[in-house]
Amino acid sequence: MMTEYTSRKLTWKDYLVVASLLFGLFFGAGNLIFPLHLGQLAGANWGTAAVGFLITGVLLPLLSVLAVAITHADGVYDIGKPLGAGFAVVFMVLIHATIGPLFGTPRTATVSFTVGMAPFLPKNMQGTALLVFSALFFLAAFAFSYHQNNILSNVGKVLNPLFLSLLFLVFVVAFARPLGNPQTAAVTSAYKHGALVNGFLEGYNTMDALAGLAFGITVVTAVRGMGQKDAKSVSKVVAKSGLLAVLAIGFIYLLLILMGAMSLGRFKVSDNGGVAFNQIVNVYGGVFGQVLLAFLLTITCLTTAVGLVAAFAQDFHKHFPQVSYHAWLALSCLASFLAANFGLDTIIAWSTPMLMFLYPLSMVLILLSVFSPLFKTDGVVYFFVILFTVVPALGDMVVAFPSVVSQSSFGLAVASLRNHLPLANMGLSWLVPALVGLVVGLVVHFVKTKKVASVLEED
C-alpha cells in the first residue's frame, strides 16, 4: 500500500516546476545560437527551415521524454536495454560522452565565454581568461549539482526563471524595433531549395534528443523526491511536464529564428549565432546590452551544465557503483573544463560527426520505445532496425569529420560508397535502410508470435 506521502496529488504548480526543470536542462548554449543562425541562413525561407528545425529540436526531444515515460526508464541504459546489456552500456557511454565532457558540457562554458565575455577582452588575453572563466564555471556547476535532491530547486526554481525574464526582455525590445523585414531577407544557397532538410539537420546541434534520454534519470529522481514513487505516477508527471517544456522551447525557437532573419536588415550572415546575438543586443543596448547578454548566456549555459554533469554522475554511479556519485561528478566537471579550453570552433568541428552518428541511432530507439507496446518491446525488432541504421550512420559520421579524416583516402572511399544510398546527398542516408530494417524486424516478430500462438493452441 502506498503511503499518504507517496500518493500525494501534484498541483499544477508542481507540474510547472518540473516543466521548468526540464526547460532549464534542455535549453542551453546551442538552443540560443543555432536557431538564431538558422534564421540568418534561411532568410525569407525562415518558416520552412523552422519546421525542419522544430522536428529535431522540439518534437524529437518530446518523444525522448515520452520514451522515458512509456518504458518507465531511468535513463539512457534502459532505452537501449532491449538490445542487451552490452549494447545498452556502450550506448549510454557514447551519449553521455557526447553531450557531456567531450562536447556538450564544454560547449556550455565556451559559448558563454566566446559570446558574453570575449568581446570585452583583447585577443592576447582570451586564452588565459577562458582558462579562469571555465574553471569558475565548472566549480559553480559542481556546487549546484553536489546534492542530488537540490537540483530541482536550484535549476527549476532559481536559475531558470531568471533566465526567462532576461530572454523575454530581449524579445520585447527586438520585436518592438525590428532590424528588417524577414520576408525580403536574402536566402543563402543551401536554403533556397533545401530549407526543410537543412533545418532538420541543424536541429541535431541542439543535442536535445540525446539530452532527453540522458536527463531521464535526473528528472525521475526529482519527481520521486516530490512524493511520486510508483512508476505510473512518475511517468505521468514526466510526460505532462515534458509537453509543457518543449512547447515553451518551440515558441522561443520560432522567435529566435525570426529574429535572426530580421537581423539581415542590418547585418550580413555571421560566423555563428553567438556573434549574431551579440550584434543584435549591441544595437539595442550598447555596452549595457552586451553585459546583459553575458549574464544571460552564463545563466542559460550554467543551467544546462548542471543538468549534464548531474545526469552523467547519476547514470555512471548507477551502473558503476564502486565509484561514488561525487567522484563521477568531479570527473565530469574536470574533463569538461579541460575540453572547454580547446575552444568553441574545435568543439563544434569535432562534435558534428558524432551527432551525425548518434542522432539516427537515438531517433530510431526513441521511436521504437514510444511504439514498443505495439510489438511487446521485442528485441528482434530493435535488432534489425539498429543493424540497418548503424552502417549508413557511420558513413555519415566519417563524411562529416574535419578534412583530416573526410578527405583522407579512407574518408573518400567511404563517401563514394555512401553516395549510392538514397538521400545521401541530404545527410539522411540512414533513413531508407532504417525503414527496411523496421519492416524486416516486424515481419520476423509477427511470424515468431504466430508460431508461438500455434504451438500453444496445439498444446
Region locations from a protein language model:
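Membrane-interface loop-to-helix entry segments
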Residues: 146-174, 351-363, 382-392
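A generic transmembrane alpha-helix motif of multi-pass inner-membrane proteins
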Residues: 378-459
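Hydrophobic, membrane-embedded alpha-helices of multi-pass small-molecule transporters
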Residues: 16-27, 97, 137, 173-180, ...
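Hydrophobic, small-residue-rich membrane helices and short re-entrant helix-turn-helix hairpins
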Residues: 147-158, 196-199, 219-248, 266-278, ...
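Membrane-water interface regions at transmembrane-helix termini and the short interhelical loops
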Residues: 68-78, 136-159, 225-228, 337-350, ...
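Hydrophobic alpha-helical segments and their helix-loop junctions in multi-pass secondary transporters
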Residues: 101, 105, 164-191, 209-210, ...
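Selective recognition of specific alpha-helical transmembrane segments in multi-pass small-molecule
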Residues: 59, 63-64, 162-174, 209-211, ...
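TM-loop-TM module centered on a large, flexible mid-protein loop between adjacent transmembrane helices
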Residues: 75-81, 252-302, 309, 318, ...
